[in-house]
């Protein structure tokens, strides 16, 4: 299984009190879902540019795998977004998260946009579990 975080997932895990966040990460590790994967484009939605305010996000991301977005992933994301019928209302970042997920074995996406992610993967043959952040 692979855990993939969008900006809502990163914010949810980074925003918890330190002890609670550590317990949650240990449980994810025990279930072989850690380290989580985060597409690099997601970082634009979680960073403020203020190193003090970004402290908890930086701490969390040091424990994650940050993945680059290549041309093929971007094309796959665009296709998912178009096929959803909601390309005008679904963020490109969410489409990239969805495209990454459908390429993984047993993916789980932790997101604050479960409806958008569900629409993106609805017509795809891959099974993607979506969890609300």
Kindly label every feature range from the protein language model.
Residues 1-38, 47-65, 125:
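Short, well-structured N-terminal submotif of metal-dependent ribonuclease cores
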Residues 56, 86, 119, 123-133:
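Short, charged, intrinsically disordered terminal tails
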